[in-house]
């Protein structure tokens, strides 16, 4: 008997995304995973750490709906659309909840993804120590 490899998005989120989890929803322009983000919102997930190279409107919506506690990113903007208003509200006014930010360079976050995919605890990135990033945080 063959097993059905297909599962609904509702069931996938219910089974694999829990309060307090770390979630990365990547994709650019037409590949932004809006359906997955909206399903996370519908299921009322909370205290998530979200990771994304360039957070955009889907993460802004998740922040605005109170799903996100911490965001790891490398560029906090919404190219072509403008500011992330809910992200700004969360950082400046703790509304709807305080938001912890962890910022990396694009190269640093890309290397972190490579390390994770390789089941390694980190990836060495030459040159990151010679920037002002750590002093500016």
Where does each model-flagged region fall?
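Conserved alpha/beta enzyme-core scaffold
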Residues: 1-137
């Amino acid at each position: 008997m063959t097993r059905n490899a297909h599962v609904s998005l509702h069931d996938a989120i219910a089974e694999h995304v829990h309060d307090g989890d770390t979630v990365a929803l990547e994709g650019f322009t037409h590949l932004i995973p809006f359906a997955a983000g909206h399903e996370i919102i519908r299921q009322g997930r909370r205290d998530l750490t979200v990771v994304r190279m360039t957070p955009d409107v889907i993460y802004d919506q998740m922040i605005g709906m109170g799903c996100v506690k911490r965001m790891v990113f490398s560029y906090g903007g919404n190219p072509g659309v403008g500011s992330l208003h809910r992200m700004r509200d969360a950082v400046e006014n703790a509304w709807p909840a305080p938001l912890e930010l962890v910022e990396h360079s694009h190269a640093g976050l890309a290397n972190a993804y490579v390390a994770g995919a390789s089941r390694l605890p980190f990836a060495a990135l030459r040159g990151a120590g010679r920037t002002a990033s750590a002093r500016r945080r």
